[in-house]
C-alpha cells in the first residue's frame, strides 16, 4: 500500500483494504459452498483452558499464524478467523494503525495457550493491525494454561 504521509488517511485506506479482504474471503467461502463457521473466529472458554495454580509463561514473541481464537464472544463478531476486521471495528483499528505508524511501542497482547495455538484475551485490534501490516510475529504475555 502506498502511504500518503497523512496518518489518518493511511489508516483509513488500510482499514478499507482489510475489510474488503474480509468480504472477499466470505464471498469465496460462499461460492465454494463452505459453511460460514469456517470463517468465524473460534471462541474459547478461559476457565476450561486455564488450570488452577498454573504460572504465567511471561512475555514471548509468538507467530501470528498460531493465534487461532478469542476468549471474548463479542470479538468473534468484529474479526474473522484471520483477524480481518468487520466495519464496526474501524475507529479503534485505525487508532492502533496510527500508533504503529508513528512508532509507538504498544503493550504486548495477552493470550492463553490452546491445543494448537493461542486464544487472545486482550489485543484483538493489535493482532488485526499486525496481520494487515504483514508482520509474522507479535509480542504476547502468555498466561498460564
Specify the residue positions occupied by each region the protein language model found.
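Ligand-binding loop in jelly-roll beta-barrel domains
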Residues: 135-137
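Short, charged/polar connector segments at secondary-structure boundaries
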Residues: 1-132
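Long, charge-dense
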Residues: 140-145
